[in-house]
Amino acid sequence: MADSPNANTRLPAPRRNVIAVLIAVAVIAGGVIGWQNIKRHIFPRHWEVVDQGMVYRSGELSSTLVKSTWEKHNIKTVVNLIGKDEQDDPAHEAAATAATELGINRAFFPLIGDVTGAVESYVGAVKAIVESKSQNNPVVVHCAAGTYRTGGVVAAYRTLVEGWTGKAAYEEMISEGVKPGPATPLVVYLNAHIGEIAQRLVEEGVIEKVPDPLPVFGP
């Protein structure tokens, strides 16, 4: 009696187990990725308070949440750190529309994704935050994910405007998702350029003097 087709094509048990595991992993991974995409439309991306009721930080908000979130927090100024090459998407278009409808001022100070870039972008961003706050206008600063570029600007604001230590600002960066360690590009950049940023803020009338000693970012 000939073997059935199923008997000839049936995979060995070990191989079947491996395939089953791979399928399960793929399903789980797909579920995680899917949830991350769904979550962006339910919760404002990386929305956090810097100064209660006045200064906020975030990632780029989804087109479904940007207007309602800005309106809820009475945002009057948006400090955008995203580069021009990252701004051609529906979320950016929705943000532009929301800003127009809500009468929000948008200020652009682009930084590269690895947080390096022009010192002037840091200076301009910190100055915009301080000016908006001084006029009692709530402000949000954001990049794409709300972690590195936003973390760098907030760290400069914390240390040079609010008087935080470099260590305290570093710990906040880590708590917000920045990779720990003195060799992290953001930490290296801040330690190399914080003096120049401070000097330019003095020249712009944002702070009275360059801190002495300068803040050192690290554990």
Question: Where do the model's predicted regions map?
Answer:
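Cys-dependent protein tyrosine phosphatase-like superfamily
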Residues: A2-V139, G152-P219
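Substrate/cofactor-recognition hotspot
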Residues: G146
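Short cysteine clusters
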Residues: C143
